């Protein structure tokens, strides 16, 4: 009886197990066949690149008097970036510290009821020489290394300028450090950018839905801070310095400023055509549709006749591991286009190229201090 029960129950079970194992083997064999069948990258042609853009308002593409070109190109850039007439917001001082002989003031500006943005004002020792006011614009990372918290590729340049006698305003940019998520105080919502972990860069992409760009909104913030700087510290003119994304902003924001005296732009100004597909830059640099009208050389040219330094580290070149690569093959062509614009205004000698030997994507403090002397 027991044998019969065993046969009745065990044999079907063994049969089912055998069938399942056979099915798995067959499925694995079929999957291997399917995998071999699938199209491989090696069978494709993957050399895509966008064709050359029209650049309809680039200086070398238009037949306009220089002054007329400047008016029309500035108006188009203002339209693309959606720069509006703005006033500085209310600013409060949170606290103050003395650091390496410099007084650093922590500031907050109210943009609207849903957003405040920070900045640091660095006041030099009053016993030393008093030099120009400076807007110091950080790159990807945060503002804190510019004022001396740590030494990274910024090399504490806001602090070094203040120690040299400059009155320095160093704003935190949207998308970075304490502003790395503009919806951080809302449950679930995320408008993040440089958060140091997995990110969809929603601060950038959400803005695109409304026709805005992160760089355009940041330019408006810098103009607000400049107005506050002028009104509260009697700043009639100022110098501007930035590196990387801050270098982009050091070229773009002064186009809409009437107070800028000199510009030191590090790690920027090659053509837009290379910064994403060739140099693997992050999306904050993007100005949607810009190449339909102009390139970086034209934007920089809108600052004519202001003296401008374009600075690079000799080793900041394209490679599989370099996500800046600002000193790329488009730099010298862009420089020639910029010089052409400055020459048309009788200011060709006001454009300088400085390449620091043996350096990567990093600020050159001695060259910066010398230029702003």
Regions found by a protein language model. Give the residues of each.
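N-terminal targeting or regulatory segments adjacent to alpha/beta-hydrolase or S9 domains
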Residues: 19-103
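Glycine-rich active-site/cofactor-binding loop and its immediate structural neighborhood
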Residues: 97-153
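Cap/lid segment of the alpha/beta-hydrolase catalytic domain
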Residues: 129, 136-220, 275-279
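Mobile cap/lid helix-loop segments that gate and shape the active-site cleft of serine hydrolases
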Residues: 201-202, 209-212, 224, 260-305, ...
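Alpha/beta-hydrolase fold nucleophile elbow
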Residues: 233-244
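Glycine-rich nucleophile elbow surrounding the catalytic serine of serine-hydrolase chemistry
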Residues: 242-254
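Short beta-strand/loop motif that positions the catalytic acidic residue
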Residues: 303, 310-312
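C-terminal catalytic histidine-bearing segment of alpha/beta-hydrolase fold enzymes
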Residues: 336, 340-373
């Amino acid at each position: 009886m027991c044998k019969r029960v065993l046969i009745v129950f065990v044999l079907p079970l063994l049969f089912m197990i055998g069938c399942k194992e056979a099915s798995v083997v067959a499925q694995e064999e079929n999957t291997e066949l399917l995998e071999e069948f699938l199209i491989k990258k090696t069978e494709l042609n993957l050399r895509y690149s966008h064709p050359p853009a029209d650049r309809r308002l680039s200086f070398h593409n238009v037949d306009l008097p220089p002054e007329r070109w400047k008016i029309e190109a500035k108006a188009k850039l203002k339209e693309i970036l959606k720069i509006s007439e703005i006033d500085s917001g209310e600013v409060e001082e949170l606290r103050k510290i003395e650091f390496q002989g410099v007084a650093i003031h922590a500031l907050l500006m109210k943009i609207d009821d849903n957003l405040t943005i920070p900045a640091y004002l660095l006041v030099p020792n009053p016993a030393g020489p008093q030099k120009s006011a400076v807007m110091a614009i950080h790159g990807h990372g945060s503002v804190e290394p510019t004022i001396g918290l740590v030494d990274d590729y910024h090399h504490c340049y806001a602090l070094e300028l203040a120690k040299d006698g400059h009155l320095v305003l160093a704003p935190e940019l949207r998308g970075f450090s304490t502003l790395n998520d503009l919806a951080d105080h809302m449950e679930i919502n995320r408008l993040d950018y440089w958060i140091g972990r997995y990110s969809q860069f929603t601060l950038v992409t959400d803005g695109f839905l409304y026709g805005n760009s992160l760089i355009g909104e940041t330019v408006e913030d810098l103009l607000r801070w400049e107005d506050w700087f002028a009104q509260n510290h009697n700043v009639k003119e100022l110098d501007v310095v930035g590196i990387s994304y801050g270098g982009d902003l050091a070229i773009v924001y002064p186009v809409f400023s009437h107070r800028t005296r000199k510009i030191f732009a590090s790690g920027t100004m090659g053509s837009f055509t290379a910064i994403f597909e060739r140099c693997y830059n992050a999306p904050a640099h993007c100005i949607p549709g810009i190449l339909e009208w102009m390139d970086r050389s034209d934007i920089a040219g809108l600052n004519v006749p202001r003296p401008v330094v374009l600075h690079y580290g000799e080793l900041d070149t394209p490679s599989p591991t370099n996500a800046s690569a600002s000193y790329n093959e488009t730099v010298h062509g862009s420089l020639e286009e910029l010089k052409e614009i400055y020459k048309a205004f009788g200011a060709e000698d006001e454009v300088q190229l400085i390449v620091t030997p043996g350096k990567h994507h990093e600020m050159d403090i001695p060259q910066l201090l010398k230029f702003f002397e």
